[in-house]
């Protein structure tokens, strides 16, 4: 293992193997402890995309909220559907929601807000690319979740995990923004393992991962966008050997996107060297 890989493995906290029952218990306890430590929290808010990550986090949150209520703590889980117009994988979103069984479902179509933002920028002489418009979608989705959380005395739960964090494969202040990120420390295959253990439909955790933000490239697989497979990323995070080409791609993503893993730099925190 190279020195940089060792540093990254330590930072990303991924275990070489996990016990599903123990891991789920730890994840639920983290969520519950956070809520119990902040008496103002009356709701937890999460956007549901129909993919592996939001399905897993949604199920964990609902299980945690159920236990909190049994312990006398008043708390609600709000699952949010955030389509941009008509969502191509809407059936999978509904399948995920049936599995999660959230207390409450809110649907907000982000298309009018995103299109107006893009148009307003265009009128100001700023013409966004399709990729940049995709980031607008991600930020609008997170803005809506924080608005709901503010209205309902809640917090926003994120879906960031270590296979995503290492590559910076998320929108800064978009899907990368949240109050808590329960599944950080898991890689992609471990997330699948937990969903299988929880009895999720195979379609939800065997689905090809995609951010699906670009109009010109609908359902673009994450692995195509990243230039490396999740299998390689997972192996790297577990301290296993990968090919030199895979190592270079992963480490380049890690270095280039370091700013996404930090709050705004100050003159005291900017790593100049």
UniProtKB/Swiss-Prot annotation:
Top-level taxon: Bacteria
Broadest EC class assigned to this enzyme: ligase
Catalysis performed (reactions): deamido-NAD(+) + NH4(+) + ATP = AMP + diphosphate + NAD(+) + H(+)
Task of the protein: Catalyzes the ATP-dependent amidation of deamido-NAD to form NAD. Uses ammonia as a nitrogen source.
Family: Belongs to the NAD synthetase family.
GO biological process, one term: NAD biosynthetic process
Protein name, per record: NH(3)-dependent NAD(+) synthetase
Binding-site positions, ATP: 47-54, 159, 188, 210
Record: residues binding Mg(2+): 53, 164
Keywords: ATP-binding, Ligase, Magnesium, Metal-binding, NAD, Nucleotide-binding
Pathway: Cofactor biosynthesis; NAD(+) biosynthesis; NAD(+) from deamido-NAD(+) (ammonia route): step 1/1
EC number assigned by the record: 6.3.1.5
Gene3D superfamilies per UniProt: HUPs
InterPro entries: NAD/GMP_synthase, NAD_synthase, NH(3)-dep_NAD(+)_synth, Rossmann-like_a/b/a_fold
Any Pfam family hit: NAD_synthase
Record carries keyword Membrane: no
Keyword flag Coiled coil: no
One MF annotation (Gene Ontology) recorded for this entry: metal ion binding
Organism encoding this protein: Staphylococcus aureus (strain NCTC 8325 / PS 47)
A Gene Ontology cellular-component term: cytoplasm
Binding site for deamido-NAD(+): 139, 172, 179, 259-260
Subunit note: Homodimer.
């Amino acid at each position: 293992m190279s020195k940089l890989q060792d540093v990254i493995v330590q930072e990303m906290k991924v275990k070489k193997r996990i016990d599903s029952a123990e891991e789920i218990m730890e994840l639920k306890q983290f969520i519950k402890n956070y809520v119990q430590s902040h008496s103002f929290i009356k709701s937890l808010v999460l956007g549901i995309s129909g993919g592996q990550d939001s399905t897993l986090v949604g199920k964990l949150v609902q299980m945690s909220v159920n236990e909190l209520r049994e312990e006398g703590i008043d708390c609600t889980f709000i699952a949010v559907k955030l389509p941009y117009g008509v969502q191509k994988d809407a059936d999978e979103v509904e399948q995920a929601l049936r599995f999660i069984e959230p207390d409450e479902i809110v649907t907000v179509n982000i298309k009018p807000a995103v299109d107006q933002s893009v148009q307003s920028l265009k009128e100001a002489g700023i013409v966004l690319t399709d990729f940049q418009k995709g980031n607008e979608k991600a930020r609008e989705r997170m803005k809506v979740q924080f608005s709901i959380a503010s209205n309902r005395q809640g917090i926003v739960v994120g879906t960031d995990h270590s296979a995503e964090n290492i590559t910076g494969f998320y929108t800064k202040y978009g899907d990368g923004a949240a109050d808590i990120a329960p599944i950080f420390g898991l890689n992609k295959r471990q997330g699948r393992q937990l969903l299988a253990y929880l009895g999720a439909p195979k379609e939800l955790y065997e689905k090809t991962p995609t951010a699906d933000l670009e109009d010109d490239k609908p359902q673009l697989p994450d692995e195509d966008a990243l230039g490396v497979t999740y299998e390689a990323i997972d192996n790297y995070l577990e301290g296993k050997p990968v090919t030199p080409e895979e190592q270079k791609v992963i480490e380049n993503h890690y270095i280039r996107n370091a700013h996404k893993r930090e709050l705004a730099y100050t003159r005291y925190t900017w790593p100049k060297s």
